[in-house]
A protein has these predicted regions:
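Zinc-dependent deaminase catalytic domain
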Residues: 1-146
Length: 146
């Protein structure tokens, strides 16, 4: 998780610095952090484009149009480099959102090690069906080194 936190330091998001590291057999396959897509201005430079929406349960959510999540950036980096991530693990500073979790499932990620819990309840049913493990990491020493 130490490397994952270092990757998060590259984030250009004003709302949360999130990092992701995809690993197989103790080798880093790809990294990602949250920020603007290539060629777009960064939130750090021009501010966030926040929109609000309601969940099916009526909870208010705020998201940024400008931001691509760390997990998606890591998946994109692997794809650009022709690196298969099937059967790999991902270390993320925060629990993935439901959209990133679905993408991770479809890429063949087997385990998600996460630091800060974020809307964990939204992933429980999907986790049961997909078999992708969600593994909390409370300290840098509680998971295999990324």
């Amino acid at each position: 998780m130490t490397i994952t936190r270092e990757v998060a330091g590259r984030s250009t998001c004003l709302r949360a610095a999130v990092g992701a590291v995809i690993v197989r057999d103790r080798s880093i396959l790809a990294t990602g952090y949250n920020g603007a897509p290539a060629g777009m201005p960064h939130c750090l430079d021009v501010g966030c484009l926040v929109y609000e929406s309601r969940t099916p349960t009526g909870d208010l959510e705020q998201n940024c149009f400008r931001t691509i999540h760390a997990e998606m950036n890591a998946i994109a980096q692997a794809a650009r480099n022709g690196t298969s991530i099937q059967g790999a693990d991902i270390y993320v500073t925060h629990t993935p959102c439901i959209h990133c979790f679905k993408a991770l499932v479809n890429t063949g990620i087997k385990r998600v090690f996460y630091g800060k819990p974020y809307k964990l309840h939204t992933l429980e049913e999907m986790r049961r069906y997909t078999g992708v493990d969600l593994v909390p990491v409370e300290s840098p020493d509680s998971a295999p080194e990324s």
